[in-house]
Amino acid sequence: MDGFREENLSYAPDLVIVGNAVVRENPEAVKLHHMGLNFCSMPQALNRFVAGGKTTLMVSGTHGKTTTSSILAWILHEAGLDPSFMIGGILKNFDSNYRLGNGPYFVVEGDEYDTAFFDKGPKFMHFR
């Protein structure tokens, strides 16, 4: 798919994940509302499909969240704990910003940015 167009939802997906950069007037947001499709924010999806059943380790603060989250994920990996993570930057040790591990931990950055146009609460409130 290239760009935001209502035709992108013509196949009626089971769930639409809406990013925080999408505005209410976005053609796909309007279409999913008119079609009555199920939707959620990225933090809600991560909590439901990735973090569910895992212990969430949230790193917050003014500076250094990406670095600290990356170090924490690497320590857990090196300890043999096979962590999952979703981090704002690309981790050099993993060559990715996300990983779906089988271990008991999910590492995520906790920032104060809003979740989506339909949820102005901070993203970190979706992880408990």
PLM regions: where:
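Long, basic/Gly/Ser/Thr-rich N-terminal segments
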Residues: 1-2
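Phosphate-binding loop of NTP-binding sites
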Residues: 7-13, 20-128
